[in-house]
């Protein structure tokens, strides 16, 4: 019985740990390597203080090492001397980081990113998983005999370099840019009724008795007083580079991914609201540069086409905002943001709430 235990248990533990690390590495590249890794950088590394220059290198090397450890745990070269201790150390670092996140946020919400977007896991769940893995590795360390270790370091280096290089080939680092692509559909509708208040001009008696200069000075003052009570003062939203007229009037700004089912649902709900409301705020869309070939299908499912821009993945996440997720829907009035729906949980887009919001006068709105 003891012989069976000594022969099968170490291999069982090694297979489990290998599976854990390989799945973790692959999950961070799902559904497409560049998109998934860029998302991992923005959501997990940027909050830790990594710069836009360091994060792409660190993410690919880290995932490459994870994949390498998943493979190396199955072979015998420097297994007890090097591979197991490094694996334990890496897991301990993860536990330390996740414990800090848990201390700050409670740990019961959000996705720790251990398995990318494929298998969402809260920080507390990830801590438990990693502690169990550490105990298994410590047990494995004492189960294995020192004489079982082989000393071909070239195998270890070769596998590690191969996995890291493969990450850079699968998801090449792109030059950081904030440029955007102009959409082929740029059918921005222009209102026939412009936002101008024209002072009524009476007959000759007014023209002859009122000086022109006094009219020029008096009328704008009254107009400004009326506008100040009926709509907010203009501010810069930060999106004028994408949509030049976004800071004038009421707008619905959306952050969508063409292949995202939740984004399509939100867009469809917006279309239904717009069809029922002639004064609905103009809909503008910022698309992530991921699966852009699906944009025609996106609009077909939505039931309408809207002006849009396409921006690269990392600039898209930056524009969406730290801690925010798709779909994102903003209610903007004269450049002021009054509501920002995002994600698919508590703050997700709510068409009933949005309909009530856009019907409110300026005096009832809170930023």
From Swiss-Prot:
Pfam families: MauE
Top-rank taxon: Bacteria
Coiled-coil stretches: none
Reported phenotype of the disruption mutant: Cells show much lower levels of proteolytic activity than the wild-type, has a longer lag phase and a slightly lower growth rate and a decreased final density. It also shows attenuated virulence, deficiency in gliding motility and enhanced biofilm formation. Quantitative analysis of the thiol groups of periplasmic proteins shows that TlpB is required for the reduction of these groups.
One example of a Gene Ontology biological process annotation: methylamine metabolic process
Keyword entries, A-Z: Membrane, Transmembrane, Transmembrane helix
InterPro entries (alphabetical): Methylamine_util_MauE, Thioredoxin-like_sf
Main localisation: membrane
Transmembrane segments: 15-35, 53-73, 83-103, 124-144, 153-173
Membrane protein topology class: Multi-pass membrane protein
Compartments, record wording: Membrane
The keyword Membrane appears for this protein: yes
Name this polypeptide is given: Protein TlpB
Gene: tlpB
